[in-house]
Amino acid sequence: MIVRAWRGRAAPAQPDDYPEHFRFRVLPALKEIKGFLGASLLRHDRPDEIEFLVLTRWTSLDAIRAFAGEHLDRAVVEPEAMEALVSFDPTVRHYEVIEEAAIRRRK
């Protein structure tokens, strides 16, 4: 499994714009791509900005290529996302998952 990581930053006055874009535009599009396994949107509040970290999970680099095109390390940032953010990383990082664990709670 491959994790694709990207960061964007929003103004504190607009804390919900990017999460709404992610939830209603990005996720539905990603779910249509073969090889997409899931995504997480993480938020870190700072005094002067809100940092979002997007982690998407994929079966392979070929699956990512179906989303990102041939330039795998270039961020895919739609105009709506650009409007919701004050800055963002122009590139992404890919990580190979070498171990994963989850806690299963008893009911």
Report each predicted region and the residues it spans.
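Residue-level signal for secondary-structure boundary sites
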Residues: Q14-D16, D62-I64, E100
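An amphipathic, aromatic/His-enriched active-site/gating alpha helix that lines ligand/cofactor pockets
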Residues: H21-I33, R57-R93
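Intrinsically disordered, low-complexity segments enriched in polar/charged residues with Gly/Pro
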Residues: Q14-D16, L27-P28, L42-D45
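Short acidic amphipathic segments
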Residues: I33-A39
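Short, well-ordered beta-strand segments in beta-rich or mixed alpha/beta enzyme
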Residues: I2-R9, S40-H71
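Short, surface-exposed ligand-recognition loops at beta-strand->loop->(often short) alpha-helix junctions
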Residues: R9-P19
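Glycine-rich beta-strand-turn "strand-cap" elements at beta-sheet edges
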Residues: S40-I50, V76-K107
